[in-house]
Amino acid sequence: MTFDSSPIAAIATAPGRGGIGVVRISGKDLSSVMRAVCGADKGSSLQARHATYLDFVNSDGSVIDQGLAIYFKAPHSYTGEDVLELQGHGGPVVLQMLLTRCLEAGADIGLRMAEPGEFTHRAFLNDKLDLAQAEGVIDLIEASTEAAAKSATQSLSGAFSKTIQELVDKITNLRMLVEATLDFPEEEIDFLEKSDARGQLTNIREALQRVFSQAAQGALLRDGLNIVLAGQPNVGKSSLLNALAGSDVAIVTPIAGTTRDKVIETIQIEGIPVNVIDTAGIRDAADAGDEVERIGIERTWAAVQTADVIVHMLDASRGPTRADEQITERFPANVPVMRVWNKIDLSGHRPAIDRMPDATHIYLSATGLLGMDLLRTELLHLVGWQQTGESLYLARERHLVALKSAHSHLEMAAQHAAHDNEATDPALDLFAEELRLAQERLSSITGEFTSDDLLGVIFSRFCIGK
């Protein structure tokens, strides 16, 4: 994202009709816009951080709307620049009229429409928030569960950034000791031994591992899970979807091939959004009823490739078949598989869970709602979810990659530090370099070392008024 410092404006509230709508303007000097849109008298006397009720007017003096004008003087604003917020009625037509008027009034100062995320980008550039906090803004807006919203607030408030910065500071202090040993080899003081550098490194590695665990758990809250129900026709996939959803979202009949296409329902399990994907029953193309069913089976296999967990449905009342084995053989090797034996009300089994070397086996009845809690718990167990009670960070993939990379560099540093090095030993230089790289990887999370291309991708995901 190329930075253009000219003033920007946009509608800051969501599209559609609402009780209140907001037009937001940010720039270095907005006095001419305030006078033009809010009237010469009131527009010239707006007090910072005070709400003033007034008319929003056209160039000919006609009233566009009535509402509140709030002026935030730099640097005490969201963006760190002068900000004017005009709060009027939330109709899309009147808001567009007000925005058009603002752009017209600000033409002489170069006022233009904001790009997506540009207000938050300016807040980042003006040190009002760091990159992890900026991502917390969009994560809070997009949160689909209460747990995800709470975790996003942790990032937005700076808790995640503070934790990362504490790790960076510890690595920096350790680097200073190593650099001192390298720079002053003639000194009799062993800086590394005296300060227990190896012990410090161990503590940093353990702390980083804890942060990664919290971030990985938070990533589940943010991204959710895709659970694909797959198996032969009439083994109870649609019944299981209905049982998980708590309503009849899928049609259930005794007729093989009833489900022709994917049926997706999003549920919550312990605050994690879970997309449960019911699919067409898998059988040989020669046995498929028609072309529509054959296409449905092809889409089943496509869905299986995108799954976080595959739930292989089987009929407990008839036991395993060769067709079940053939389906198993086609599952991706890198995706966890759970074998769910349905219809235990007909087989005489009790609800149970059996963790076998090949897969976890669960015995339940979808129609009788027996063993459903076992299924929910095991789904989260398979993807590493642990209800620890600790605060979680709504981490993104780039955060996890940076944390993993930093941990790898610290592991390498530990290997170099394991030797009793003299100050001239090349391993000590490598020790210092690995610490530097770990520090750099962690700093990329908060945006201290981040490319312009990455910034463009991150902020482009925001809505225009944010």
Curated annotation (Swiss-Prot):
(6S)-5-formyl-5,6,7,8-tetrahydrofolate binds at R24, E85, K128, K466. Mg(2+) binds at S238, T259. GO terms for molecular function: GTP binding; GTPase activity; metal ion binding. One of its GO terms (cellular component) is cytosol. The keyword Cell membrane does not apply. It is found in: Cytoplasm. Keywords: Cytoplasm, GTP-binding, Hydrolase, Magnesium, Metal-binding, Nucleotide-binding, Potassium, tRNA processing. GO terms for biological process: tRNA methylation; tRNA wobble uridine modification. InterPro entries: G_TrmE, GTP-bd, GTP-bd_TrmE_N, GTPase_MnmE, MnmE_dom2, MnmE_helical, P-loop_NTPase, Small_GTP-bd. Its cofactor is K(+). Residues 224-384 form the TrmE-type G domain. Homodimer. Heterotetramer of two MnmE and two MnmG subunits. Exhibits a very high intrinsic GTPase hydrolysis rate. Involved in the addition of a carboxymethylaminomethyl (cmnm) group at the wobble position (U34) of certain tRNAs, forming tRNA-cmnm(5)s(2)U34. This is tRNA modification GTPase MnmE. It comes from Herminiimonas arsenicoxydans. The gene is mnmE.
